From Swiss-Prot:
This is UPF0102 protein Sputw3181_3835. One of its GO terms (molecular function) is nucleic acid binding. It comes from Shewanella sp. (strain W3-18-1). Belongs to the UPF0102 family. PANTHER family: UPF0102 PROTEIN YRAN. Signal peptide: none annotated. InterPro entries: Restrct_endonuc-II-like, tRNA_endonuc-like_dom_sf, UPF0102_YraN-like. It holds the Pfam family UPF0102. The lineage of its organism: Bacteria, Pseudomonadati, Pseudomonadota, Gammaproteobacteria, Alteromonadales. It comes from the Bacteria.
Amino acid sequence: MILGQAAETLAQSHLEQQGLTFVERNVRYPFGEIDLVMRHKNHWVFVEVKYRSATQYGGALQAVSKAQIGRIRLAASHYLQIHRLDVPCRFDVVAIEGHQIHWLVDAF
């Protein structure tokens, strides 16, 4: 069984193999959290990592709720403000189901 931090490590490694550069992990604010902050070319990428050992109750991609998307967007906006970044960004999801990794670019 993979737990949260192990899933994030696996997702980070997968994204680095795809050419992204790691910036920061587990950025927390009172109103939201960003699992991974990465860079890809000139884009800053805010990544939500979801893990499910089985899909019988819904897959990892379906586990991202509208409320969670709102919190991630708010956290990313705050991150860009406090770091004084005026750069293009996107939101990706890495869904790990069992031993399969699915990377959804520009997910929301």
